[in-house]
Amino acid sequence: MKRLGVFLILASIVCGVVAICGCTGGGGTDYSSSTASAETETCPVQILEHHLVRKDYGTVYVEGVAQNVGNKRLKFVEIKARFYDADGVLIDEFMDVHRDVDPGQKFRFKIIGPIGEEGKKVAKYDIAVGTWWTE
């Protein structure tokens, strides 16, 4: 029982640290999310461009380009998007994952969002770099 208590305390501390070390995406959004990197507080990924695409049957997605602006290879990077209706109510959030991104490397991402009726409701989105870590 004592071990469970220690585990819960440590888990709470880790979650708090991860939540504090956020990384905001480009495009002027305030969408902050967590990072798994304890080495630095500076986000090594910059979102260079992004836009919303609508397809048939209510499919929406965000595509764009990001870059590793750090000096280390990134083993894992998430680019996340949250989708909202016209009233600003969150519909859902989705992400795209990339692995082994070298320093200076640019990469394209495509975040497939809600589909069908939910996709038709999307009026706006925001985007950010999610979890990332280096070698």
UniProtKB/Swiss-Prot annotation:
The keyword Disulfide bond does not apply. It is a single-pass membrane protein. InterPro entries: FxLYD_dom (IPR047676). It is found in: Membrane. One of its GO terms (cellular component) is membrane. It comes from the Archaea. The keyword Iron does not apply. Keywords: Membrane, Transmembrane, Transmembrane helix. The chain crosses the membrane at residues 4-24. NCBIfam families: FxLYD_dom (NF038353). This is Uncharacterized protein MJ0360. It comes from Methanocaldococcus jannaschii (strain ATCC 43067 / DSM 2661 / JAL-1 / JCM 10045 / NBRC 100440).
